[in-house]
Design a protein with these regions (language model features):
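Conserved ABC ATPase "signature" region
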Residues: 100-101, 141, 154-173, 282-283
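A short, proline-enriched helix->beta-strand linker immediately N-terminal to the Walker B motif
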Residues: 197-201
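Conserved ABC transporter NBD signature motif
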Residues: 90-101
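P-loop NTP-binding/switch modules centered on Walker-like glycine-rich loops
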Residues: 68, 82, 108, 204-208, ...
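Conserved ABC ATPase signature
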Residues: 177-182, 186
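Charged, flexible cofactor/metal-binding loops and thiol motifs
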Residues: 26-29, 265-361
Length: 361
């Protein structure tokens, strides 16, 4: 996902209505999303990018959101942050940050929340950083945006502390460098430093390690792991890399055609997935122990057109279980709550109960 470098500072797009949000009592959840739906309208077509998504996150929880390209992962992140641009719009739903529905905030109120209580780390740090400003000035800008009374000298000191916190050596000196003078991994560390500058309750990381080599990827994940514990931050990690999810996350949401089709703990999804799509995704991951079994399997067919969704289950035309089952093509599955050896799971599949008891991977 490539966005302008100053996206976290800009005003949100106008919403249909902007009543003052009612402040709720502090919730046990850092973030609760209820029935969130987002569409993109293009002439006669309406693309349903996010469809009735709900989930909860406690402080320090790490949720991995996985799925094929076009499944709605980045649209979900932008919807939560209030950064959907026309022709897109959030149709409805609640986004409760510490019990406060930020979906009802005005533009000005949302700008005060974004970057302070909820923050974003992008896939490409060069898109997130202004190439003509020093690293120090950009971190200072992020700090004083939410603490305008802070003296510039104190903000610069805080910027150096943040660079040290993300393991950048010679922090004081590196404040005066420009983004092109940093390596890719160090730029990603700077992006993380800016995101945590105001101790957000929730951090959304959209493919933060995709452009990094394996060693740097491991270092960045270790850094995020440490920051989660220090700041008690809940993290939504959006990625194609199932190995990263396995190493870093507590829970996994498998997204397909704009919906969460399976949500559970990491152990369950990786060791014994219930939804056929989750199982198919895992079988596409290279496994040295299965090299002798033949070519790497691929999921047959293509994801559905989100402007012309099929009736019934969206995965049915590609599903090895439901492809020939009339019910799967005619009736959309409801969420099933199933018990697994590693905890509860929520699965949108007509065969969820039967499949939850089977060993598949």
């Amino acid at each position: 996902m490539r966005l302008p470098w100053n996206i976290m500072q800009r005003e949100a797009q106008p919403r249909a209505s902007e009543p003052a949000a009612r402040v709720e009592e502090r919730s046990e959840f850092a973030l609760s999303v209820r029935n969130l739906s987002t569409v993109f309208e293009d002439g006669s077509k309406t693309v349903h990018a996010v469809r009735d998504v709900s989930f909860d996150m406690r402080p320090t929880e790490r949720l991995g959101v996985v799925g094929e390209s076009g499944s709605g992962k980045s649209a979900l992140a932008l919807s939560i942050l209030g950064l959907i641009e026309p022709p897109g719009k959030v149709l409805g739903g609640e986004i409760l940050l510490d019990g406060r529905d930020i979906a009802k905030l005005s533009d000005r109120q949302l700008s005060a929340v974004r970057g302070k209580d909820i923050a974003l780390v992008l896939q490409d740090p060069m898109s997130a950083l202004d190439p003509v400003k020093t690293i120090g000035s950009q971190i200072v800008e992020a700090v004083v945006a939410h603490e305008p009374q802070l003296r510039r000298s104190a903000a610069r000191k805080r910027a150096a502390e943040l660079l040290r916190e993300v393991d950048i050596p010679q922090a004081e000196r590196r404040l005066d460098d420009y983004p092109h003078q940093y390596s890719g991994g160090m730029r990603q560390r700077v992006a993380i430093a800016i995101a945590i500058a105001n101790n957000p309750r929730v951090l959304i990381a959209d493919e933060p390690t995709t452009a990094l080599d394996v060693t740097t990827q491991s270092q960045v994940l270790g850094l995020l792991d440490r920051l989660v514990e220090q700041h008690r931050t809940a993290v939504i990690l959006i990625t194609h890399n199932l190995g990263v999810v396995s190493d870093f996350c507590d829970s996994v949401a498998v997204m397909y055609a704009g919906r969460f089709v399976e949500t559970s703990g990491v152990d369950h999804v990786f060791l014994n997935p219930t939804h056929p799509y989750s199982e198919a995704l895992l079988k596409c991951v290279p496994n040295p122990e299965r090299l002798a079994e033949g070519p790497l399997p691929a999921i047959t067919g293509f994801p559905p057109d989100l402007a012309q969704l099929p009736g019934g289950c969206s995965f049915a035309p590609r599903c090895p279980v439901g492809r020939e089952v009339a019910q799967c093509h005619e009736q959309a599955p409801r969420p099933h709550h199933v018990a697994t050896a590693s905890g509860p799971a929520e699965v949108e599949c007509h065969f969820a109960e039967q499949r939850s008891a089977q060993v598949k991977v």
